[in-house]
UniProtKB/Swiss-Prot annotation:
Protein name: Histidinol-phosphate aminotransferase
Subunit structure: Homodimer.
InterPro entries: Aminotrans_II_pyridoxalP_BS, Aminotransferase_I/II_large, HisP_aminotrans, HistidinolP_aminotransfase, PyrdxlP-dep_Trfase, PyrdxlP-dep_Trfase_major, PyrdxlP-dep_Trfase_small
Recorded GO MF terms: histidinol-phosphate transaminase activity; pyridoxal phosphate binding
């Protein structure tokens, strides 16, 4: 009676839970919004009618984000988190008999959504250093005649990025819709693919406000694409999905973007410091990061995960991903949280 694809899909779980003295397992921004800004947001929200539906789409929030990006409003659509936008795009691009190419490892939701749509999944392994194999992606897309390509860059869980030129090579070569998921772009050394949208009608760029903008609890995401493509991929989208509170919050944060800039600078400085200290710890291999999180390889990831959790520090065991045996992932936290983690790792 149910979708047969459910037999091959597991319920999403966060190993170790979501509570800890030092929580570094979900790639979150360690800085919450300041109280004065929350008060401003709530004061505005109090004057909104709570008994009325919000707009079908949050047009004011979309216009504000388009202005922030420097693009036309008709290129932008807002969603209830980037995950909701992923559901929408996958529904629009895939179905039985169609194929999607996913570099592996990548964000686990991609594979889940593809299988729910009963689409074929073409996996292209990363290099051993977890970097993208661009030539293999292009070759597989042609050979398999895929309809859709999903590129998480910077990538979760590997923390590696495609260069701007590499993205353009793939988009230009592909006879397919290409989704570039830029959830972590604010932390990257590489240039965004946004400027390619005017030249490539098959390109979609995905953004989230959950990471750099510290709005994970508000659920705000965006897709940016040419108007014709955006109109088509928006057809399956759930109406009224974005709350007025989320829209007001987004606009307030964009008006005070120096808070984001300061947080990103802090995180990048801490990332560099953590990487430098990790390289001095015997038995730990550190992969260079282009995100707000780091990947390390240890002798026994399950044992290290357990010891850290017992000491009050929650990280993510990503050993189940291809090429990531005995790897752990943790986001950059506050300096004192990072020091706690480093101290424990040095004692292992």
């Amino acid at each position: 009676m149910l979708n047969p694809a459910l037999e091959h899909i597991e319920t999403y779980k966060v190993e170790g839970g979501q509570e800890a003295e030092v929580k570094l397992n979900q790639n979150e921004n360690p800085f919450d919004l300041p109280s004065w800004l929350k008060d401003k947001i709530l004061d505005q929200f109090r004057h909104e009618p709570w008994n009325r539906y919000p707009d079908i789409l949050p047009y004011r929030g979309m216009a504000a984000y388009a202005s922030f990006l420097g693009v036309k409003p008709e290129l932008v659509i807002m969603s209830n988190g980037s995950n909701e936008m992923l559901y929408t795009i996958f529904m629009a691009c895939l179905g039985a008999g169609r194929k999607v190419l996913i570099p592996e490892p990548s964000f686990s939701l991609y594979d889940k959504l593809a299988r729910l749509q009963q689409a074929g999944v073409v996996e292209v392994p990363m290099h051993d250093d977890l970097s993208f194999d661009v030539d293999a992606i292009i070759e597989a897309a042609r050979r398999e005649k895929v309809d859709f390509i999903v590129l998480s860059t910077p990538n979760n869980p590997t923390s590696k990025s495609l260069s701007h030129d590499e993205i353009e090579r793939i988009v230009e070569a592909a006879d397919a819709i290409v989704l570039v998921d830029e959830a972590y772009v604010e932390f990257s050394r590489e240039q965004s693919a946004l400027d390619l949208i005017d030249r490539y009608p098959n390109l979609i760029v995905l953004r989230t406000m959950s990471k750099a903008l510290a709005l994970a609890g508000m659920r705000i995401g965006f897709a940016i694409a040419n108007p014709e493509l955006l109109a088509e991929i928006s057809k399956p989208k759930i109406p009224f999905a974005s709350s007025r509170l989320a829209e007001i919050t987004l606009m307030a944060v964009l008006e005070n973007y120096s808070l984001v800039t300061d947080a990103v600078q802090y995180i990048l400085a801490e990332r560099g410091r953590i990487e430098a200290e990790l390289t001095e710890i015997p038995g730990i291999h550190t992969f260079e990061s282009d995100t707000n999180f780091l990947i390390i390889r240890v002798a026994n990831a399950s044992e290290v995960f357990r010891k850290l959790k017992n000491a009050g520090v929650l990280v993510r065991n990503v050993s189940g991903y291809p090429l990531m045996e005995n790897c752990l992932r943790f986001n950059v936290g506050l300096r004192e949280e990072n020091d706690r983690l480093l101290e424990l790792l040095k004692k292992l």
